[in-house]
Amino acid sequence: LDVVMGLENRIVYDIVDVVENNCRLEQAMIRDKRYDGLYLLPAAQTRDKTSVTPFQMKELVGDLKEEMEMDYVIVDSPAGIEQGFKNAIAGADRAIIVTTPEISAVRDADRIIGLLEAEGLRDPEVIINRIRADMVDRGDMMGIEDMIEILAIDLIGIVPEDEGIVVSTNKGEPIALNDKAKAGEAYRNIARRIMGEDLPMMKLEKDNFITRFKKLVGLS
């Protein structure tokens, strides 16, 4: 996330420094250059990520909500079900699973749903990432309806495959700030749904020659 947000060069302390009392919580938090109310608390940069326990993570999330008065605390979980996953869900009261339209990814997501429910996180939601309408139409990619039928949880957003994400990541400029990018629109819609708005799902655009040309010249 530090790279995506363009904050990687401003990291001095990280989450391990906080739990080991090497710095105060507010010292480790990096304020975004564009939004005053947006902060990043970096993960461990060099040390073992198991240095943080689920108990410490739960306390940390509580401090962010109460002492720092954060409206939302979003914990980005690493892939898999190892210690990083256990830490991520320790202080969570809501879970959003991000998956892709691949059979193996959907199986993993289904397994994660079971683990979340076993930990008391009921009613998780799902984001379907990197979906392409043309491949779905050809039968080369799982469709949204098929995935939701398998997972049996609510859909909170779909994100189309977008080459602009690579460009925005390399520039350290979140694509959500790009008004012309479909993926940016998708992310903004997801954020609004998280905040309680009822929005229809965006219609997927088939990636044909015309749409690729528009993206190339900056018309879409």
Predicted regions and their residues:
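Conserved catalytic-core segment of NTP-binding enzymes
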Residues: 55-59, 63-67, 77-170
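Generic structural signal for secondary-structure transition and capping sites
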Residues: 23-24, 164, 199
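Short beta->alpha junction loops/turns
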Residues: 8, 46, 78, 101-102, ...
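NTP-binding/hydrolysis catalytic cores, primarily Walker-type P-loop NTPases
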Residues: 171-220
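P-loop/Walker-type NTP enzyme "switch/lid" segment
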Residues: 1-68, 169-176
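Residue-level recognition of specific faces of alpha-helices
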Residues: 3, 17, 37-40, 94, ...
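Generic secondary-structure signature for well-ordered alpha-helical cores
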Residues: 34, 118, 152-153, 161, ...
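Walker B beta-strand of ABC/ABC-like P-loop ATPase nucleotide-binding domains
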Residues: 73-74
